Amino acid sequence: MLPPPRPAAALALPVLLLLLVVLTPPPTGARPSPGPDYLRRGWMRLLAEGEGCAPCRPEECAAPRGCLAGRVRDACGCCWECANLEGQLCDLDPSAHFYGHCGEQLECRLDTGGDLSRGEVPEPLCACRSQSPLCGSDGHTYSQICRLQEAARARPDANLTVAHPGPCESGPQIVSHPYDTWNVTGQDVIFGCEVFAYPMASIEWRKDGLDIQLPGDDPHISVQFRGGPQRFEVTGWLQIQAVRPSDEGTYRCLGRNALGQVEAPASLTVLTPDQLNSTGIPQLRSLNLVPEEEAESEENDDYY
């Protein structure tokens, strides 16, 4: 015996729920959110596939707005739609139209940056073809052409263009400054400093009241430098081993290149064990002093 036919209302309910999900607009913002927007556009394309492509009437196409990565043709090759931005999901197969196609200067690549050994599946993401920095006509350095084009489309009235390849010339800028700190005699102290500049900056350390560049001839003070962590940056450290009361004072990180100089001070407070016991940690914290361990943890934070 055949089961009784389902009422028409029951058959239509799943379709209505799907349409409600599909047609719900994504949250607004300068850069579209990858998840909801992809689901909406992808399911809309799947629904359209069942109907096939209607005759193309460009005059009936809605003009897309806010396309920071430019425009591409839709699945039927008729109307324009916003292209996908860098970092958004995309269709590896050019003939597919679920996630969408990447914009100008972008290409769809498998992102293998995840931990494949733990079962993470590579995703197809839009990636910029070039990773070379550029100087914009606004005097700002852009990490690559795709970022500059996004900024240009976000601010069309600015007439932003490429001034020249490579970063804009810039005086030094302190990216991560040394922090005020304290410690007990006999312990080690480290100050850190990161400087951005183009041309590259040099870093030196000085102490208020001394005319020499550290470390001088002091065997318990050492300095170290390395490039990075980002391009056109340099990082410097000042280490004082087994601090003494005479080490107390203000130390300065100085960054300079041909276009200028910048500096950032940090104070060191040195306590004897007796002073520490009589003063107490709460009183020290009221002076806005940061212990060495906390200062190091803040310096290791990603500042981008």
Swiss-Prot record:
Cystine pairings recorded for this chain: C53-C76, C56-C78, C61-C79, C67-C82, C90-C108, C102-C126, C135-C168, C193-C253
Positions annotated as glycosylated: N159, N183, N277
Where does this protein chiefly localize? secreted
Residues in a coiled coil are none
The entry lists its GO molecular-function terms as: insulin-like growth factor binding
Write out the annotated subcellular location: Secreted, Extracellular space, Extracellular matrix
One GO term of the biological process aspect: ossification
Please report a single Pfam family linked to this protein: I-set
**Which ranges carry the Ig-like C2-type domain?**
172-269
The record's listing under Gene3D superfamilies reads: 3.30.60.30, 4.10.40.20, Immunoglobulins
Q: Which PROSITE patterns match?
A: IG_LIKE, IGFBP_N_2, KAZAL_2
Q: Which residues form the Kazal-like domain?
A: 120-170
Q: Where is the signal peptide?
A: 1-30
Q: Which GO terms describe its cellular component?
A: extracellular space; interstitial matrix
Q: What domain of life does the UniProt record list for this protein's source?
A: Eukaryota
Which UniProt keyword terms apply here? Developmental protein, Differentiation, Disulfide bond, Extracellular matrix, Glycoprotein, Immunoglobulin domain, Osteogenesis, Secreted, Signal
The record's annotation in InterPro entries points to: Growth_fac_rcpt_cys_sf (IPR009030), Ig-like_dom (IPR007110), Ig-like_dom_sf (IPR036179), Ig-like_fold (IPR013783), Ig_I-set (IPR013098), Ig_sub (IPR003599), Ig_sub2 (IPR003598), IGFBP-like (IPR000867)
* Residue ranges of domain IGFBP N-terminal in the record: 49-129
Q: Which PANTHER family match?
A: INSULIN-LIKE GROWTH FACTOR BINDING PROTEIN-RELATED, KAZAL-TYPE SERINE PROTEASE INHIBITOR DOMAIN-CONTAINING PROTEIN 1
Say what the protein does: Involved in the proliferation of osteoblasts during bone formation and bone regeneration. Promotes matrix assembly.
Q: What's the protein here called?
A: Kazal-type serine protease inhibitor domain-containing protein 1
Task: Please tell me the species this chain comes from.
Answer: Homo sapiens
